[in-house]
């Protein structure tokens, strides 16, 4: 197989369902992942954190106060705690203080009910899924749909979890090996905002690795001076020594100012041999690049498909979206337009 070829996927631009179809269902639930699959996502994205007994589960962060009904469970009131994680102090309930059996008694709820009231209608209908359950869903859905549906796990706060005796890298690799998905051509990407854990993972697995980059700040493990430095041509060449691609904030490609022009990041990454999967394409005005907003409220859906088409035109290799069906529509029209131009 040629280097960089994705044998498992039929499309040149991948649709990655960000926390599932999180624009229409509460994030990181089986409801959200199934919705994403039904809408044509190529990959579903579980963020992974460990339980007290070392099981990987899908939550965007280990503080579950905002995404579950834990606050309504009097039996867990005493678990409320204040912790400092990656330099940020927060109060809530944390996955590492619950066994899997205890977490399974909780129910998920919508993170952004003011922006997405329709999602809140599904509050209480889903539990917190394990990584193994998500892998099983992807495999079942692949067989049922006759197309490969991959997974795109992110290791959340790996340095923090290692510091409290719950390292996640080996658990993640073990789950992939058990699934038979520990290969370079498996329908899997592993992503992280940190650097050293990706380097460790490179020694542990041949699965493709993605270095995430934020528009500001630096990796929590202090392995690089800043994400901005990592996004320079020299920084990207260093990333290419251990990663298959990068997952930058979309504002690193198109600055979040009116009339912005795209940066050189995609071209520089491609020159270093890296794929580019930016995040996150969301339909609501508040999240759109300024030129793609429409009159209305922050919750009003703007021109997300135009925004995605623009980024496909810039040369991205995939993209994260909360709305996979809009991503699928945008990709189809962009590829059709490109094919039409190719006839000229």
Residue ranges and their predicted role:
Residues 1-344:
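Phosphate-group recognition and catalysis centered on beta-loop-alpha active-site segments
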């Amino acid at each position: 197989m040629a280097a960089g070829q994705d044998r498992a996927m039929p499309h040149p631009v991948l649709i990655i369902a960000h926390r599932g179809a999180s624009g229409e269902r509460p994030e990181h639930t089986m409801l959200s992942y199934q919705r994403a699959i039904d809408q044509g996502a190529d990959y579903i994205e579980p963020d992974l954190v460990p339980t007290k007994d070392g099981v990987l589960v899908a939550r965007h962060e280990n503080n579950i106060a905002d995404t579950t009904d834990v606050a309504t469970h009097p039996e867990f009131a005493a678990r409320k705690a204040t912790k400092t994680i990656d330099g940020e102090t927060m109060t809530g309930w944390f996955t590492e203080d619950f066994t899997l059996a205890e977490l399974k008694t909780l129910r998920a709820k919508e993170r952004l009910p003011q922006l997405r009231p329709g999602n809140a209608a599904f509050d209480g209908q889903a539990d917190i899924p394990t990584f193994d359950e998500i892998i099983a869903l992807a495999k079942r859905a692949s067989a049922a749909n006759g197309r490969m549906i991959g997974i795109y796990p992110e290791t959340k706060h790996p340095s923090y979890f290692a510091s409290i005796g719950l390292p996640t890298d080996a658990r993640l690799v073990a789950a992939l090996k058990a699934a038979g998905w520990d290969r370079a051509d498996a329908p899997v990407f592993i992503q992280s905002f940190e650097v050293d854990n990706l380097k460790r993972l490179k020694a542990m697995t041949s699965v493709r690795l993605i270095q995430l980059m934020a528009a500001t700040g630096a990796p929590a493990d202090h392995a690089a001076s800043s994400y901005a430095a990592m996004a320079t041509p020299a920084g990207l060449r260093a990333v290419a020594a251990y990663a298959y691609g990068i997952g930058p904030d979309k504002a690193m490609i198109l600055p979040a100012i009116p009339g912005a022009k795209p940066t050189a990041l995609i071209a520089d990454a491609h020159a270093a041999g890296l794929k580019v999967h930016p995040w996150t394409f969301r339909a609501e005005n508040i999240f759109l690049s300024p030129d793609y907003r429409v009159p209305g409220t922050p919750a009003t859906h703007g021109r997300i498909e135009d925004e995605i088409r623009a980024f496909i035109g810039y040369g991205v290799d995939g993209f994260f979206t909360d709305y996979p069906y809009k991503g699928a529509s945008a990709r189809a029209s962009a590829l059709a337009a490109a094919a039409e131009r190719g006839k000229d």
